[in-house]
Amino acid sequence: MSKDKKMVEVRTYNWGPCLIKLKIQDDFKKILIDEAAKNEKDFSDKLAGQIRKETGYSEESRNKIIPFLSPYLGIYDKMFEKYQTKKFDRKPEYALTALWANFQRQYEFNPPHDHDGKLSFVIYLSIPEPLKKENEAYKGKSCGPGGIQFMYGDGIRDNISYVSHFPEEGDMFIFPAWLKHWVCPYSTDCVRVSVS
């Protein structure tokens, strides 16, 4: 390029929902597991999943979990401001109105769905080794067995309309509650545990 030619200034724009992925600390993971063991409420009638065991956390458990969850919501707020390239007029306030654990087994799945409220998340507590191997052997282009896929838009060509991910233990996604997502079934005889 000759010295007298100017560089073209280019800017790309973020488009669609703000979706973030991060790793939770071990103490947060531990309290989610410990409190899930106390869950007695069947949550299946409130959820879209084709999953036999979906249990709700009690209000007492949710109150224990909030101090662990709050810093991650703060991270989301900062990332959202960066994503929007503007500061909040007023810092968002959140209420943990529901919390449940999904104990997904062989052939079970979560069809495309969204969540109630304004903001939501999913945290992965257990991804068994045989499921990891099944996913590694998968040859398709979707999220594969036991994976999660977030969808936005009409699927127009030359447009990114989904994000696929095979989770690891401790992964956390935070996203607008209206963002559609789904979970693929798998054939391995094991239990994959997530919390939302």
Regions found by a protein language model. Give the residues of each.
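Non-heme Fe(II)/2-oxoglutarate
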Residues: 2-100, 104-110
